[in-house]
């Protein structure tokens, strides 16, 4: 199982990933696959309406995401990718809950990821491109098994915790993008959660 579950919801510090740098990452397949996904998405980014990050903190958006998660079952049909429903839920738990203290994740950030990648993937793009492979701490091994009911209830808890995080002090740094504003967190979570729920027709 990826990540260590912790019950508290206060922000946690990222563990240091020694040697993480652009020079190191540029030789990995994950870096190039993610770069290809970004380039392929650019034309669509000009046609899709931008996402208001602060909408994440509204009652309407909170209820929408909770209802979509609540209605998800192990039988939901996969639309793309290779993850199972339980693996997808665990992936979202890591991605959404790490910076609220539910998990301890490695710091994989470097200058380019905290500036250029953050601007492209958070501030510019209105959707998550298909095929991103970063950060590695969010990746789920194909053979990993997770308890569907636990992961579902965990995600509902994390949705509540993130919805209540209304100041920058409530958030720890993102493993790839570093410290972010409340609005940036709201936008990133909206597009990431929506992407993976649509992945399973939820």
Cite the ranges covered by each PLM segment.
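Short, helix-capping/interhelical loops that line the mouth of catalytic, cofactor-
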Residues: 35-54, 102-154
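A non-catalytic, amphipathic alpha-helix used as a structural packing/dimerization or gating element
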Residues: 150, 154-157, 191, 195
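Short, contiguous alpha-helical
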Residues: 75-123, 164, 171-202
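N-terminal export leaders
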Residues: 16-17, 23-32, 38
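An N-terminal domain-cap segment
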Residues: 53-82
């Amino acid at each position: 199982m990826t990540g260590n579950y912790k019950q508290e919801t206060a922000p946690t510090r990222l563990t240091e990933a020694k040697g993480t740098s652009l020079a190191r990452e540029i030789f990995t397949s994950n870096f190039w696959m993610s770069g290809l996904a970004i380039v392929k998405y650019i034309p669509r980014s000009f046609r899709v309406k931008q996402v208001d990050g602060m909408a994440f903190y509204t009652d309407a958006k909170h209820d929408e995401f909770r209802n979509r998660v609540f209605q998800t079952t192990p039988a939901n049909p996969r639309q793309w990718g290779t993850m199972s429903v339980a693996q997808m839920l665990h992936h979202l738990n890591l991605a959404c809950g790490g910076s609220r203290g539910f998990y301890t994740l490695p710091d994989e950030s470097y200058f380019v990821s905290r500036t250029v990648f953050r601007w492209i993937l958070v501030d510019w793009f209105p959707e998550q491109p298909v095929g991103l492979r970063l950060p590695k701490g969010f990746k789920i091994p194909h053979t990993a098994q997770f308890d569907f009911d636990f992961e579902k209830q965990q995600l509902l808890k994390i949705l509540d915790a993130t919805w209540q995080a209304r100041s920058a002090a409530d958030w720890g740094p993102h493993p790839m993008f570093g410290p972010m504003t409340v609005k940036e967190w709201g936008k990133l979570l909206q597009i990431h959660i929506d992407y993976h729920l649509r992945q399973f027709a939820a």
